[in-house]
Amino acid sequence: MQRYLVGGAVRDALLGRVSDDRDWVLVGANVDELIADGYIAVGQDFPVFLHPQTREEHALARTERKTAPGYHGFLFHADPNVTLEEDLLRRDLTINAIAQDEAGTLIDPFGGQRDLAAKRLRHVSPAFAEDPVRILRVARFAARFADFSVADETRTLMREMVAQGEVDALVAERVWQELARGLMEATPSRMFEVLRDCGALARLLPEVDRLWGVPQRADYHPEIDTGVHLMMVLDMAARLHASLPVRFACLGHDLGKGTTPVDVLPRHLGHEQRSAALVREVGARLRVPVACRELADVVAREHGNVHRSAGLDAAAIVRLIERCDGWRRPERFDEMLLACECDARGRLGLGEAAYPQRARLARALAIARSVDTAEVAAQAAARGLGGPAVGAAIQAARVAAVAAGLDAPPS
């Protein structure tokens, strides 16, 4: 039995990056031998085992053959006679098809090191076309390695796959899994640019794809193009180390601009509510986690009000916080403010601009939440008030607190 480190760990080491992704391929091994040695079987679709000491994943060398459309339409073959090169041949990109033996020797039959040096994402073999998820993976790797280009022959193959309807067979959960990982990369805009280039974005996320070419008012958006703006917002979210819910909210905040009637462009009156409706549709279709959906809905509805909050009085600010469920979910309110900052700074020439709305509204929430609502309710009850009148008294106390304290100079 020979053991080889493969995939991301080898690639990242060659790039001088730290990697927690250590996967191994076993050549010449069989299941009974591994079980006897204490390996723990965990694979469902093909033989994968955890090492008894390190708990790192070890897979039997295998080949695969396409038998049906979509992600699950594969037949896997694993036995001791499958060679390392046969196993590497089934992988997606040459940079992921490099192995290293236990003595440190690299095995690179498909030119992965050459493509790393050229900063190129290139498919290993025509079998790439058998798995539509690989289109998403290439886009995700483009977001991770932003200075890498997709090889011309790989771009051509991806376009052919889209034209043949392969991406239409992808299950929602798999699409979301790859999109989520791509959103969390250093330059998420590259993922969407690659998907758009091959036509996959129009099939998987038409709500996003149609934003390119939609103009915005230059006095608010010097970059003008809505698609360009969206990409700048996503990259700002990455720069500010935003969470996945924030990044998904950034992705969806302006979807409604893609449905603005042509005769009113470049204005987008009412796009917030249209965006919220589209975010809900996308979230349901891709089975996006609830936390991501709910934040995206709030951001889509309220980002314009947050941007304009300097002109809101205390009562309007308290109503804004209430609509965002800020009393019960202050952490989500903070995430909403971060998404709004990404939107404001994701514009041409505004990447370093201050966004005082975020700190000011966070302070307003803190002031309003400091109101002793139990005491206010008790005082209202003592005056003979009940029901909605108690809620109104609490609301008035919060408004008074914000009015008195929000813009007061520090003591």
Question: Where are the regions a protein language model picked out?
Answer:
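Catalytic cores of the polymerase beta-like nucleotidyltransferase superfamily
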Residues: M1-S411
